Amino acid sequence: MIEADRIISGQAKVDEDVIDRAIRPKLLADYVGQPQVREQMDIFIKAAKLRQDALDHLLIFGPPGLGKTTLANIVANEMGVNIRTTSGPVLEKAGDLAAMLTNLEPHDVLFIDEIHRLSPAIEEVLYPAMEDYQLDIMIGEGPAARSIKLDLPPFTLVGATTRAGSLTSPLRDRFGIVQRLEFYSVEDLTSIVARSADCLNLELEQQAAFEVARRSRGTPRIANRLLRRVRDYADVRNGGIISINVAKQALSMLDVDDAGFDYLDRKLLSAVIERFDGGPVGLDNLAAAIGEERDTIEDVLEPYLIQQGFLQRTPRGRIATSQTYRHFGLQKLSD
């Protein structure tokens, strides 16, 4: 199964971009959850505006769907500047990055998603740009080639990544602010679902908002996606009114269980229990057993399962916890 095809995938889908922009908070005052990040960014932004400086370069990391792009746009809005958006895989040539940098206005935000996927050549261009607001460009080729320096306006680079550990030390060290986004509480997600319902003019009961939230794996993007699918169900089956029973029926139809697990989650946990006697099992063996890439397990499936206490990562491999056995109605054998 392709990760992006899952209803509970934290990754963005192409057709969601327009709707997501419509319901995305624009300012910190509307930003729900991540209280420590919100408080710190409020201070940093106000201080930069008081000094009339560009905000320090900002690195945002965490699992997919937690609002890294949203936070980058909020930073630009709060600073009252423009934001230019790109991603690591798109920046193939130094000239691509140079063109973006030279078109920035003072204090503008350059947002690079998936920044861990930048090539070494692009990183070399970024170092002086981030540190000294200078751009080194090579003119000509061969023996006649020469380097010229261009001054850049003070700007803020906002980098987003799901794999902070994959960043090179020289690049990571150039970020003055580093923020980690955590999975959201059910209470915060309930508020997000209710806010999104208001933006979409939906008739949503509070209990239904909670039901969607608790199955959303701590991830706003998943919560909003499930809300839209529940809306479809309600439009067809209940005159557009999203009650608690309608929400439960719709989510059951979507094969999202009470813990927010889908078939792939249950397949992974079942494999650990049934094929490997609860573990420990190595990542490569587990990937082979369920027919998925090890990166998919490590970056997409595991974070939520570990955070929720269903899977334990040890030096010897992955282990199913007692909570996993209870979820499947099984009794864990004593060692």
From Swiss-Prot:
Pfam families xrefs: AAA_lid_4 (PF17864), RuvB_C (PF05491), RuvB_N (PF05496)
Residues at which DNA binds: 294, 313, 318
Residues binding Mg(2+), per UniProt: 69
InterPro entries reported for this sequence: AAA+_ATPase, AAA_lid_4, DNA_helicase_Holl-junc_RuvB, P-loop_NTPase, RuvB-like_N, RuvB_C, WH-like_DNA-bd_sf, WH_DNA-bd_sf
GO BP term, pick one: DNA repair
Region (Large ATPase domain (RuvB-L)), start-end ranges: 4-184
Gene Ontology CC: cytoplasm; Holliday junction resolvase complex
Ligand binding (ATP): 23-24, 65, 68-70, 131-133, 174, 184, 221
Catalytic reaction equation(s): ATP + H2O = ADP + phosphate + H(+)
Alphabetical list of CDD domains matching this protein: AAA (cd00009)
Enzyme class: hydrolase
GO molecular function terms listed in the Swiss-Prot or TrEMBL record: ATP binding; ATP hydrolysis activity; four-way junction DNA binding; four-way junction helicase activity
Keywords of this entry: ATP-binding, Cytoplasm, DNA damage, DNA recombination, DNA repair, DNA-binding, Hydrolase, Nucleotide-binding
Ranges for region Small ATPAse domain (RuvB-S): 185-255
Region (Head domain (RuvB-H)): 258-335
E.C. code: 3.6.4.-
Subunit comment: Homohexamer. Forms an RuvA(8)-RuvB(12)-Holliday junction (HJ) complex. HJ DNA is sandwiched between 2 RuvA tetramers; dsDNA enters through RuvA and exits via RuvB. An RuvB hexamer assembles on each DNA strand where it exits the tetramer. Each RuvB hexamer is contacted by two RuvA subunits (via domain III) on 2 adjacent RuvB subunits; this complex drives branch migration. In the full resolvosome a probable DNA-RuvA(4)-RuvB(12)-RuvC(2) complex forms which resolves the HJ.
Function: The RuvA-RuvB-RuvC complex processes Holliday junction (HJ) DNA during genetic recombination and DNA repair, while the RuvA-RuvB complex plays an important role in the rescue of blocked DNA replication forks via replication fork reversal (RFR). RuvA specifically binds to HJ cruciform DNA, conferring on it an open structure. The RuvB hexamer acts as an ATP-dependent pump, pulling dsDNA into and through the RuvAB complex. RuvB forms 2 homohexamers on either side of HJ DNA bound by 1 or 2 RuvA tetramers; 4 subunits per hexamer contact DNA at a time.
Entry-linked HAMAP family: DNA_HJ_migration_RuvB
Protein name (record): Holliday junction branch migration complex subunit RuvB
Species, as recorded: Haemophilus influenzae (strain 86-028NP)
Gene name per UniProt: ruvB
